[in-house]
Amino acid sequence: MLSKQIPLGIYEKALPAGECWLERLQLAKTLGFDFVEMSVDETDDRLSRLDWSREQRLALVNAIVETGVRVPSMCLSAHRRFPLGSEDDAVRAQGLEIMRKAIQFAQDVGIRVIQLAGYDVYYQEANNETRRRFRDGLKESVEMASRAQVTLAMEIMDYPLMNSISKALGYAHYFNNPWFQLYPDIGNLSAWDNDVQMELQAGIGHIVAVHVKDTKPGVFKNVPFGEGVVDFERCFETLKQSGYCGPYLIEMWSETAEDPAAEVAKARDWVKARMAKAGMVEAA
């Protein structure tokens, strides 16, 4: 019988860097996490995962089976470099090919959710044409994901195009497809001028996972928990009362820290204490 406890995961980039997934999942298990979210970012090293051999993919699956720690989601931020909204046809084609490979990879190793970055373009100036291309590229991507039974979920971003659940819901309603959903980041959501609790309630029924991090206005990464503007307890209470029972993912970038495991353990305890205050988990 499946446990009724809240699934709590950790982002790959919070743990020591490297390509040994057995070691990474063993560490995550030691730290008390249920799952790890894989990163496929714009670096050549992480992009190369999409070209893993059958044996490399099987090694990941075996590590999951051996440890009991799942890898149910992928953070696909490679589209910063190869955006679906690019006005350069070659770059956009690369972006669509990355999407195709990511969906195939997910299908092969059991990843259920691919979190998408809501940028039409990142390093270029946006305009109406980049947004049209982005929307059309997403439509094509959702069609691919539907055939593979892999969910594409839009992150709430550090970027105006997708900085609220309301904006992401516009795309969800436009596509009207069960394989396109939302993956809000309560840190990003709180850093903008949003009514955070109303936004979270508006997304219920479309939220498949939640990123947990702290932020400040204009500062979206590496804000220590408790030093930013996020009202974690209220966010957790709102999600619980709205009926959300899905996973939470602590997002950190401590892979190059002197002691990543210690940093992660500290963050885990801090987040779980706020969850306990919100009535989501038992107090330690």
Curated annotation (Swiss-Prot):
A Pfam cross-reference name: AP_endonuc_2
GO molecular function: intramolecular oxidoreductase activity, interconverting aldoses and ketoses; L-ribulose-5-phosphate 3-epimerase activity
Keywords, in A-Z order: Isomerase
Induction info: Induced by L-ascorbate. Repressed by UlaR.
Catalytic activity, as annotated: L-ribulose 5-phosphate = L-xylulose 5-phosphate
GO BP of this protein: L-ascorbic acid catabolic process
Top enzyme class: isomerase
Known pathway: Cofactor degradation; L-ascorbate degradation; D-xylulose 5-phosphate from L-ascorbate: step 3/4
Signal peptide, first to last residue: none
InterPro entries: L-Ru-5P_3-Epase, L-Ru-5P_3-Epase_Enterobacteria, Sugar_Epim/Isomerase, Xyl_isomerase-like_sf, Xyl_isomerase-like_TIM-brl
SUPFAM superfamilies given in the database record: Xylose isomerase-like
UniProt-listed Enzyme Commission number(s): 5.1.3.22
Keyword Isomerase included in the entry's annotation: yes
Membership in a protein family: Belongs to the L-ribulose-5-phosphate 3-epimerase family.
Function of the molecule: Catalyzes the isomerization of L-xylulose-5-phosphate to L-ribulose-5-phosphate. Is involved in the anaerobic L-ascorbate utilization.
Descriptive protein name: L-ribulose-5-phosphate 3-epimerase UlaE
UniProt lineage: Bacteria, Pseudomonadati, Pseudomonadota, Gammaproteobacteria, Enterobacterales
Gene that produces this protein: ulaE
